[in-house]
Amino acid sequence: MVFVKNWDDFEIAVENMYLANPQNCRLTMKYAHSKGHILLKMTDNVKCVQYKAENMPDLRKIEKITSNLVGHMASKE
């Protein structure tokens, strides 16, 4: 498991991982109230990337990446 510090790197890694193997990829989100952060984890059963979101602007980024993945799932490519 690799924690990615930069959002842009995480977003690129998630999209590339999904496009390479869409059948085995999954994105999970876990909210830790006591720590005040959201942990995002994308895995394809071979490799795993994680990102820790700790502030409000990151929520918009999470919404954007989720909609991008849903768009890929809905497209016929």
From Swiss-Prot:
Keywords linked to the UniProt accession: Cytoplasm, Ribonucleoprotein, RNA-binding, Signal recognition particle
InterPro entries, per database record: Signal_recog_particle_SRP9/14, SRP9, SRP9-like, SRP9_dom
GO cellular component: signal recognition particle, endoplasmic reticulum targeting
Record's subcellular location: Cytoplasm
UniProt-listed GO biological process terms: negative regulation of translational elongation; SRP-dependent cotranslational protein targeting to membrane
GO molecular function: 7S RNA binding
Record Gene3D superfamilies: Signal recognition particle alu RNA binding heterodimer, srp9/1
Classification via Pfam families: SRP9-21
Subunit structure: Heterodimer with Srp14; binds RNA as heterodimer. Component of a signal recognition particle complex that consists of a 7SL RNA molecule and six protein subunits: Srp72, Srp68, Srp54, Srp19, Srp14 and Srp9.
Function field: Component of the signal recognition particle (SRP) complex, a ribonucleoprotein complex that mediates the cotranslational targeting of secretory and membrane proteins to the endoplasmic reticulum (ER). SRP9 together with Srp14 and the Alu portion of the SRP RNA, constitutes the elongation arrest domain of SRP. The complex of Srp9 and Srp14 is required for SRP RNA binding.
Family: Belongs to the SRP9 family.
Protein name, per record: Signal recognition particle 9 kDa protein
Species per Swiss-Prot/TrEMBL record: Drosophila melanogaster
